[in-house]
Amino acid sequence: MSLADSVLAINNDLPIRTDSPVHSGKVRSVYWLTDADSRRLITTKGYNVPEDTPLAIMVISDRISAFDCIFHGEGGLKGIPGKGAALNAISNHWFKLFAENGLADSHILDIPHPFVWIVQKARPIKVEAICRQYITGSMWRAYSKGERVFCGITLPEGLEKDQKLPELLITPSTKGILTGIPGVPAQDDVNISRSDIEANYQAFGFEKLEDIDLYEKLLKDGFKVISKALADIDQVFVDTKFEFGYVTDKDGNSKLIYMDEVGTPDSSRIWDGAAYRDGKILENSKEGFRQFLLNHFPDPDVLLNKDRMPEREALARDNDLPLEAMMQVSRTYTGVAEKVTGAPIPLPANPKADIIKILREEYDLIV
């Protein structure tokens, strides 16, 4: 089979039994199981959740998005070989480490295949929980233009690009478009302060005011666990985005959990430690792909200017990126995953067929 065949680009057409529309995100697709199948799996697989918990099959793809667009390569390559399996493997590793360190649970109940999670339904917090240890990216661009207050936090004068910040900063933004919140524009991905969240905690999805402290603790503790583990393999954990939600446990109590992915090259910046000590930035995350795109196209403003979104979408749709650029991203993702987990990343020749086979034979979920 060709390299293109090994890439799972379309992940919303699997014949999984469901009575709800498939939810397709930029990278993952979610298939909500029927009530009968959810109850059957909870019983037969022994998942530690209430018997009426809705379950979903979450299938990751190898697609790559940047600047809110999906990009593709030469030779019919619609994604990055190994990317999906690498992202899941990294998240699985960090969630396991979180559990070992006594942090919160995640939404994942089972991992049938490197591309697949079985997850429990959660009530999401409508906050992108962003943590920054270094000043770079959008924060540096704003700081260099004179901004000093970020999400209600005042930064000192004299900071330099890419330097370590005096303390770990929490700089949240809105998740989705939220309306009716004083002082918060009804736009996706708007920076907010802790005081914004406190004053409107229920609108942001928090069940109790004190859970804001818990979310910040889980964010900082999770960051520190990953940062320490990455330092052990000479990688620098620069910044990251976590997501949180509530689930109901077997005793009927709400508990805050980690959701989505954590500490991956998609959701984080990761730098090579040796290069950083040498005064250079070597990206081991999607940031390297973003920088490639900014250098590859003659007018990078198309990628940065939100007012030029139609042009940007056409740019992504109409241009096949060089194969070597796509494979460099593949090497970055699989390389980080193998360093983090200490194990090779499986690259199945036909992942879709493998997923269908496992979900049919071991879970009886294929129609």
UniProtKB/Swiss-Prot annotation:
Keywords associated with the record: ATP-binding, Ligase, Nucleotide-binding, Purine biosynthesis
Lineage, opening ranks: Bacteria, Pseudomonadati, Pseudomonadota, Gammaproteobacteria, Alteromonadales
Pathway it works in: Purine metabolism; IMP biosynthesis via de novo pathway; 5-amino-1-(5-phospho-D-ribosyl)imidazole-4-carboxamide from 5-amino-1-(5-phospho-D-ribosyl)imidazole-4-carboxylate: step 1/2
Gene name for this UniProt entry: purC
The reaction(s) this protein catalyses: 5-amino-1-(5-phospho-D-ribosyl)imidazole-4-carboxylate + L-aspartate + ATP = (2S)-2-[5-amino-1-(5-phospho-beta-D-ribosyl)imidazole-4-carboxamido]succinate + ADP + phosphate + 2 H(+)
Key word Transmembrane present: no
Pfam families in the cross-refs: SAICAR_synt
GO biological process terms held by the UniProt record: 'de novo' IMP biosynthetic process
EC number(s) reported in the record: 6.3.2.6
PANTHER family: PHOSPHORIBOSYLAMINOIMIDAZOLE-SUCCINOCARBOXAMIDE SYNTHASE
Protein's UniProt keywords contain Metal-binding: no
Family according to the record: Belongs to the SAICAR synthetase family.
Gene Ontology molecular function: ATP binding; phosphoribosylaminoimidazolesuccinocarboxamide synthase activity
Entry protein name: Phosphoribosylaminoimidazole-succinocarboxamide synthase
Top-level taxon of the source organism: Bacteria
Gene Ontology CC terms: cytoplasm
Broadest EC class assigned to this enzyme: ligase
